[in-house]
Amino acid sequence: MTDRRRFPGAFAAISALLMSLAGVTAGAAPPAAVAQFQPFKIGSYSAVALKDGGIEEPVDGKSFIVGQSNEEVAAVLKAGGAPADHFEFSIQPLLVHAGVRVLLFDTGAGGFFGDIAGKLPESMKEAGEKPASVTDIFISHAHGDHIGGLVTSTGALAFPNATIHISTQEWKWLSGLSEDEAKNFGIHQVSALVSAIKPKVVPFEPGADLLKGIVKAVPLGGHTPGHSGYRIGSGPDSVLLFGDAMHSYVVSVRKPSWQVAFDGDQQLGATTRIALVKSSVASGQRLYSEHFPFPGIGKIVKGKDGASWQPESLH
């Protein structure tokens, strides 16, 4: 059983998020999700950003950034061109055609988050992609907005022919969650979910070369026990998908040391972000974010005011 004491911030923050999605807390609800897709290239691979939905969180010192004044957070958001009173997080899995393989990185929220998410199937259809064609799914971590789309509304496998890659530590953690604990992480009917996907799951160790020359796991600790990013492709056109190591295209990049409420280990999460921003600026690494503004592909660059997110120009 998962020890709640190891993840106090994550339990509280995600519980608050789910309450707000259910309309328990005051404030305007995020708009209903719409299907959307954006093709781009990763070297010779064809990739597609797939919109699943989006989440909004208030600037209140507890829902996302903790330990900073609301005024300080608002000032950073405003300086970065974002709304000063709330955070906007997109949800966008990534699909990649690599030779005969069709790779899907995370699966969105499925039915877990109501009508603000769960549009991955529609986005795939609009992009001309078929769930049955997906050969491999790579899970960054086991929160509802990343694994909810693994199953359909009836509990069947949404991608019946896909091997599901997830880190050994993350799989162990997910498999050990009680129903009540799982709800705090945005997961409903966790036992049924685990049972459905178990025959397809292939756990891996941190840093594993999963598909040689195509996908390599990159450990990015702090958010969940076995949180993993993925390097896709090789050479200068490769892309690093970093999961939930960063959430906000403004705050996570400009203030990576600021701690996040729903990181299981908030200090490790901050350390990971600091290193990720620093290495990305130095290397010019292309990045894919599942929560930055759609379509989530770009780089982190250094300017006179510090680091900032530079979306890739796609035509």
Q: Where is each model-derived feature located?
A:
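Metallo-beta-lactamase
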Residues: 2, 6, 11-12, 18-121, 125-129, 133, ...
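A short acidic, glycine-rich active-site loop
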Residues: 76-87, 128, 260-273
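Active-site environment of divalent metal-dependent phosphoester hydrolases
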Residues: 35, 58, 142-149, 173, ...
